[in-house]
UniProtKB/Swiss-Prot annotation:
Protein name: Plant intracellular Ras-group-related LRR protein 6
Record function comment: Leucine-rich repeat protein that likely mediates protein interactions, possibly in the context of signal transduction.
SUPFAM superfamilies: L domain-like
Summary of the tissues where the protein is detected: Widely expressed but at low levels.
SMART domains: LRR_BAC (SM00364), LRR_TYP (SM00369)
Keyword Heme: no
Organism in which the protein naturally occurs: Oryza sativa subsp. japonica (Rice)
Keyword Repeat: yes
GO biological process terms on file: intracellular signal transduction
Alphabetized Pfam families for the sequence: LRR_1, LRR_8
Amino acid sequence: MERVLKSARESGSLNLSNRSLREVPKEVYNNLDTGAQDEKWWEGVDLQKLILAHNNLEVLREDLRNLSSLVVLNISHNNISSLPAAIGDLPLLKSLDVSSNQINAFPEEIGFATALVKVDCSNNCLTDLPVSLARCLELSELNASNNTISVLPDELAGCSKLFRLNLEGNKLVTLSDKMFMSWTMLTEMNAAKNLLTAIPDGIGALSKLIRLDLHQNKITLIPPSIKDCSSLAEFYMGNNLLTSIPEDIGMLSNLGILDLHSNQLKEYPVGACRLKLSFLDLSNNSLSGLPAELGTMTTLRKLLLTGNPMRTLRSSLVSGPTTALLKYLRSRLSSDEGASGSGSTPTKDDQIAAARRLSLSSKELDLSGLGVTSVPPAAWETNDVMKLDLSKNSIEDLPNELSLCSSLQSLILSNNKIKRWPGTVFSSLASLSLLKLDNNPLAEILATDLEALSKLEVLDLSGSASSLPEPSAVSKLPHLKELYLRRMKLHGFPDSLLGLKLLRILDLSQNYLTSVPEGIKDLTSLIELDLSDNNITTLPPELGLLEPNLQVLKLDGNPLRSIRRTLLERGTKAILKYLKEKLPAE
């Protein structure tokens, strides 16, 4: 023990886990001061990290306040039933792990530990969370799963920096709109295994939400506002009381996993067939058939349908390979179309007119895939359109009339034949926050070309190798949050990207990168980094400093030699932890 304490006096970090301790050594409460004659006090370091996990501790004394420099405290997996008020006298405490104890209440003094960033109080006996926790304005991760909490204090809405919240396995009946409207930074939320009966309409405010797990509740309805959760990639709603799902769910363009098993669904809406899912679980519902349009979901790899009273599908299709079922549905779709009336096909003018009518209420004009060679006048005839989709056409130039669309926030020009940067038009679109120009034969983009788009938050230039912006160009986009540069024939990581402090998603896949700069650590807002299909052989340890914000790191298709494949298969968290541990000790 003396050797461990001596080492801790030098490093400021003490790990006494798995030692069958029944009480905390008194030297710990004395900030490692043993009073030994040969100690040189000036060589000592205040205790900053204390790990007492997996022991038999029953009490944490008020003397804890002596450890005023403590940043990390882990007392998980003990027999502690209460926390001392002194927890509030730790002004530097950022991480508190009290999980797997017998704690039945937090002291109100927890609210004075205002530096707290991460709190794990899972697997305890808590019936509520203290109102004072709302004073911890830096709180970004809260795990209160597997307790008996029945209500959350409204004041928690003040913790606006929360990005990961786990409330699984409690007794929550409701979640308030006020909280959802405030927690706009949330990327991951788990409220599974509760008693929830509804999802608040305010869910739409969570535009950064990537994973939402609400399985095993008593929810009867998914609100249409779910369509505004534009980043949602995984949505788990199994074991609820749903009888239908909204058509608008089809607008979730990033959704890859949708779990709706064990509900009371009687139909799967045609609108939801627009989703680009890889996994869809509809098992144990009341479905008697499926829309033929579901066959167009070519991204679907797994579709589960067992436990439904299917009357329009053979059992061999229901239980067979997903690809066979999709092929059958597609064939039914084509035969249905052939048998529906006169066989006349709507003209382009009809399609444009219909799209314009829809845009009057939605403010979104979809003119994609019409095969037009120029922008139809419908695009600028109403100047209040906020989203314009002109993708998958053969457009070569943007007309100056498009400058009239002063309300335009999203402009999608993917998969066209645009060669020249439409600077005149873009300079008039002051509200533009999303621009997709991927897969166009664009010429070089100058730094001055991007100056007019200073409010841009999302930019996609993928597949346009000759249009790689000048090195200083992206620095003109200080608000950029998402940048997609797939298939750009990049041979080096653009240093100018390292100054984009708000960047949350960076896609550099399918290039020729051989390395990643140490400066990647400066992109502290990143939640997704795609480096797949490059020539990267090693990763800098500094990449590990992006944990825990970075949630998705894609590395497939690289000849990585410095990281074992077994580690790569364990996913982002394991990789970042490994890299972080390789950093030299300070």
